[in-house]
Regions:
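Glycine/small-residue-rich interface belts in oligomeric ring/scaffold proteins
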Residues: 1-57
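Internal, well-folded beta-alpha domain core
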Residues: 34-191
Length: 191
């Protein structure tokens, strides 16, 4: 999702959590994400524990150690299956109104530096950012030639062609509790 890319790029710059939503807002940025390979998934079962308030406690007499009550573990531990995309490669095109942030990001990416290790949400999903280039967007091209995802409002289904839809968060803003989603977008793509 767009929000994942915004968070990933903000982490590269070392921006504090919930501080970058205006930079990547709908009217100040544009992001395009294109898969560069056929996406394959793998299902991996994992045991999970609850992280609700009150379930995680500090261990008495031990600095920095947290524990979950064994009774909570016995009752609440669940096996869940997570689906991961395997060896994925994406092209990300970015336009920012904030020229200073864009230049700083370009400098970080072109030199292979990042403040925080780029990841797609989990430590198992570390990202490697390569082939960083700058280009100028020009009018023209074939508006019918799309091999990626397309916003739902621009989709014209073709009989006999499979099509999938996915609704994802697109925009966020900071609030008293951290952040809230302010807009969603639905994308269509060929499976």
């Amino acid at each position: 999702p767009r929000t994942t890319v915004a968070g990933l790029l903000a982490a590269v710059l070392g921006e504090p959590r919930d501080s970058y939503y205006d930079t990547f807002a709908k009217d100040t940025s544009a992001i395009a994400i294109s898969p560069e390979c056929e996406l394959q998934t793998q299902s991996i079962p994992q045991l999970t524990l609850p992280t609700k308030g009150g379930n995680i406690m500090t261990a008495d007499g031990v600095s920095g150690k947290t524990v979950v009550d064994p009774e909570v573990i016995a009752e609440e531990r669940k096996r869940r299956t997570f689906e991961y995309v395997v060896d994925a490669a994406y092209r990300i095109d970015l336009v920012l109104d904030d020229t200073e942030t864009f230049e700083r990001l370009a400098e970080f990416l072109e030199s292979g530096r990042s403040t925080y290790t780029p990841s797609l949400g989990k430590t198992e999903c570390l990202a490697d950012i390569t082939d960083v280039t700058r280009s100028t967007v020009e009018d023209g091209g074939n508006p019918e030639d799309v091999d990626s995802t397309v916003p739902e409002e621009h989709v014209v289904p073709t009989p006999g062609e499979p099509l999938r839809m996915e609704r994802t968060p697109a925009y966020m803003e900071a609030d008293d509790g951290g952040r809230k989603t302010t807009g969603f977008v639905s994308y269509a793509f060929a499976p």
